[in-house]
Amino acid sequence: MNLQHHFLIAMPSLQDPLFKRSVVYICEHNSDGAMGIVINKPVEQFTVENVLHKLKIMPADRDPAIRLDKPVFAGGPLADDRGFILHTPRDGFGSSIGISPQTMITTSKDVLETLGTADQPDDVLVALGYSGWEQGKLERELMENAWLTTPADSEILFHTPIASRWREAAKTLGIDIHNIANQAGHA
């Protein structure tokens, strides 16, 4: 089972405050573990514009029509002082990895330098930190019914209102997340 480019959808029973009602976009999943970004937990009153200002990134060719008041997300509890940028594919960034034909992750500053300009990727999600699972941990959590999984959807990742992402991700499975039980039967 490879869950790269999938969403993890927290079951209603998952009460860990870091992951309660979370949707995690899985960037990498292999025999060593998994890495993902929470896509529906914004950092309170912290925007992409704040990040650029704090890093003193002020592109000369800034396009005022491009909004930078988008939220920055709490991607997870690990390396929460580092930025992780999910975006639609675009060449030319120093530390980019293709996750799927529709999505890349970049950790280098050069992607931030394009934000607010005509050179920025079409869709961008900026997060601080990431979520990680060591070898076998995510698989155990799945067996314990902590998460649902579904293939990722770019519309949910980049365009669905933040407060609706948990519910909408579950809807891709044909379920109402509020009406499911957290216990699975075993025959």
UniProtKB/Swiss-Prot annotation:
Cystine bridges: none
GO CC field: cytosol
Pfam families documented for this protein: DUF179
InterPro entries assigned to the protein according to its UniProt record, in alphabetical order: AlgH-like
UniProt cross-references to Gene3D superfamilies, sorted A to Z: VC0467-like
HAMAP family: UPF0301
Family: Belongs to the UPF0301 (AlgH) family.
The protein's name in its UniProt record: UPF0301 protein SG2023
Species for this entry: Sodalis glossinidius (strain morsitans)
